[in-house]
Curated annotation (Swiss-Prot):
Topology relative to the membrane: Peripheral membrane protein
High-level lineage: Eukaryota, Metazoa, Chordata, Craniata, Vertebrata
Residue ranges occupied by any BAR domain in the UniProt entry: 243-446
Skewed-composition ranges (Low complexity): 70-84
Name recorded for this polypeptide: Sorting nexin-30
One MF annotation (Gene Ontology) recorded for this entry: phosphatidylinositol binding
Length: 446
């Protein structure tokens, strides 16, 4: 590449009825979750933010048991880690049936005369006959991922396309070349490709094949807009002023649910950011607080060991808090924001479905006025009806798939959050317990 320096390496890092749609944070279990509980799977449930807190005030007042009736072991906080391992094992078993594996890793920084950007290695392993080789390894930058998503939207308008992480960041607030930002984006891009690779339709898209295998995408990017996309634009133009008369209730229900779901996640995102800000401020105070005891110990010969112990204890607590804050910033918030973007993308597809139905209704009404002149239904009306039915079938299947993925993602997210908090309080408890012998030891004055 002309005018560029050597790349700098960065650290690598079942089907469900649409009427049974449930908020991921709802306290009421679904039938599917009940079935999972009977088979021994552990289900983590969280009360809805809208409901008052009716939980028992103490552990003694609460019946601690697992969904399958097995009493919970409260004496071993580390049991949450075993639950996380069980969820990971379920993912490994699902992976045995897949035939396409995609991974995004190894980000590298490229400094050119005109711009500076990050590329990521995209590795593919597959047994599909559509691919010439069983393994591929190419490098892609963010705009390549954006090109892929746009092509999927053009060629697969009846399906939910997974979201990409937001492209623009506020300059001066977020350093888009920092290791933390690059790693967070890498995880999001990896999740984006994995969702496409697991989709029974999107994974066979020709543009996805090109993205995974082509060494250079420039020749493919120069191709003009597809005919299907132009047809979609004409539909929007023709039906922009038409109001639907017979919109299916199930799709109206999905739209209402997505609005509420997105609102709840937005609230969680804002509150979580405030919590992180307060934790960072508290962390800064702790870092100043601990050394004071260490300095003081130099003046108190008789209290030297206890004061040094308190200083070390505060230091250990600040380290544990830093780890908890980093986990919330790098693991918790990205999932919340991904599903906020996912909801917005899904609502866009639902609007396209309404536009196709509006086109069908408009043509059907026009054909009805001429029914006396014709004995058969016009071909274009039948084609529009087929489009609507295709849209409906694809959206129902994608909605079921999205609900299953969402339930699994939020289960892992909440389980991970619980596990990290347990680890934090365990470390703080251990730190404070370690200095009790020093405080109880009565030293004789010399």
């Amino acid at each position: 590449m002309s005018g560029s320096s050597t790349p700098k390496s960065l650290p690598t890092s079942g089907q469900q009825s649409l009427h049974d749609i449930k908020h991921p944070l709802s306290c009421s279990p679904s039938a599917e979750d009940d079935a999972a509980g009977e088979n021994g799977a552990v289900i983590i449930e969280s009360p809805s933010p809208d409901l008052p807190n009716t939980e028992p005030s103490s552990l003694a007042d609460k019946d601690l048991s697992l969904p399958n009736g097995t009493p919970a072991d409260t004496s071993s906080p580390a049991s949450s880690s075993s639950l996380l391992n069980r969820l990971q094992l379920d993912d490994d078993l699902d992976g045995e049936t897949r035939d396409l594996f995609v991974t995004v890793d190894d980000p590298k920084k490229h400094v050119c005369t005109m711009e500076t950007y990050i590329t990521y290695r995209v590795s593919t392993k597959t047994t599909r006959t559509e691919f010439d080789l069983p393994e591929y390894s190419i490098r892609r930058r963010y705009q390549d991922f954006d090109w892929l998503r746009n092509k999927l939207e053009e060629t697969q308008p009846t399906h939910f396309i997974p979201p990409l992480p937001e492209k623009f960041v506020v300059k001066g607030v977020v350093d888009r070349f920092s290791e933390e930002f690059v790693e967070t984006r890498r995880k999001a891009l990896d999740k984006f490709l994995k969702r496409i690779a697991d989709h029974p339709v999107l994974s066979f898209n020709e543009h996805f094949n090109v993205f995974l295998t082509a060494k250079d995408l420039n020749s493919h990017k120069k191709q003009g807009i597809t005919l299907l996309s132009k047809m979609g634009e004409s539909v929007r133009y023709v039906t922009s002023g038409y109001k639907l008369r017979n919109r299916p209730v199930e799709f109206a229900t999905i739209t209402d649910y997505l609005d509420t779901f997105q609102l709840k996640l937005g609230t969680i995102d804002r509150i979580a950011q405030r919590i992180i800000k307060e934790e960072v401020e508290y962390l800064m105070e702790l870092r100043e607080y601990g050394p004071v005891y260490s300095t003081w110990s130099g003046l108190e010969r008789e209290l030297n060991e206890p004061l040094e112990g308190v200083s070390a204890c505060v230091g250990n607590c600040s380290t544990a808090l830093e780890e908890l804050t980093e986990d919330m910033s790098e693991d918790f918030l990205p999932v919340i924001r991904e599903y906020m973007l996912y909801s917005e993308s899904m609502k866009t597809v639902l609007k396209k479905r309404d536009q196709v139905q509006a086109e069908y209704e408009a043509k059907a009404e026009a054909a009805a006025l001429k029914r006396e002149e014709r004995s058969t239904v016009p071909t274009d009306v039948e084609k529009c009806q087929d489009k609507v039915e295709c849209f409906n079938a694809d959206l129902k299947a994608d909605m079921d798939r999205w609900q299953n993925n969402k339930r699994q993602d939020f289960r892992q997210l909440l389980m991970g959050m619980a596990d990290k908090n347990i680890q934090y309080y365990e470390k703080c408890l251990t730190a404070w317990e370690s200095i009790i012998p020093l405080l109880q030891d009565k030293q004789e004055p010399k």
